[in-house]
Amino acid sequence: MTLRLKNAEMHEEINKPIFVVGSPRSGTSILAWCLGYHPNIFPVPESNWMGDFAVNLAKSYQIGAARGIFSILSAMGISHEEFFSHIGRSINSLVLKHRCDLDRQRLIIAVQRLLKERGLYLGEVTGEFDAATSAAVEQYEMVDKTLYSELVDSLRTAGSDSEYKTRWVDQTPEYSFHICGLRKLFPSALFIHIVRDVDSVVRSMLNFHRIAGTHLAANEEEAYKYWLRTVRACLKAEEAYGPHVVYRLRYTTLLENPESTLRSLLDFLGEPYSAKCLEPLSERINSSNVPPDFKSEDPATDPAIVEEARRLSAEIEQTSRPTECSPAAAEELEAEFGTRIKHLARVQ
């Protein structure tokens, strides 16, 4: 498959990735899933690497321009902005180039899981259509010929849905702390800050290990602190870059008024409304499947931390997002980015 990039303007036009940020267990995944049903947007797995990559890239630029006319970047007049955005365009092109491969792998994973449930496939779920998977698919024909036919057709056409999609959405929560760096890589990127009431998030965080086997937070106090850090970082980005770059979305409005919420969101993204984006919401959302009787309270938790988080959560519910950008806040984020570069230099 080849990308249909007719000219430089087309290349610029499609270099507009979307990042869903916010605290873990706030709805980042379901929102990205909804957007992934749009005819022009496809979801990618949480990437995690691009935030730190931007910091390393900035350090590399400093080295490459350290000696003025005797360093390649400065001698050739390659600016910090050009250096970053050029590499960002390369990342974007690479993601677009392999979008059909991602679709195919996801489909094969779904097929392998289905076959394992039916006892026809005993191997690992790898996303690779190996000999064992092929043999299991053939066996499946004897079990359900109709579904077998649909399954084979799906495997043959895997990737066709995403072939002409020109934008991707990433839902890595940790990117809440890296919005400044990501904007250097992708100057036209848009960010969606999805926010959910803190108590629900904490319950979901503490219950997460029951279904995923890993802990998002060691205890209740750490969960409240985690929510505070991520949400404050996103609020600072809202203030710094304004409503044309960072869009605040409340988790409750997505559930209670999905159509109007997605219409408004897609308008922000510059995409036409598509009712297909509602399809993932037709299934009941139960974040982390938190049991009604699940107890998250810990007597060792500092009540001041809980109060601080609940107060901020209530303020967010009662206030609107900023109506304009703040140069002062943007400078703060630039300073934080610079501090990370200095820290990297020290540890290296």
Question: What are these model-predicted stretches?
Answer:
Residues 1-18, 99-106, 206-209, 235-239, ...:
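PAPS-dependent sulfotransferases, especially Golgi type II membrane carbohydrate sulfotransferases
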Residues 29-41:
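A conserved segment at the C-terminal end of the G1
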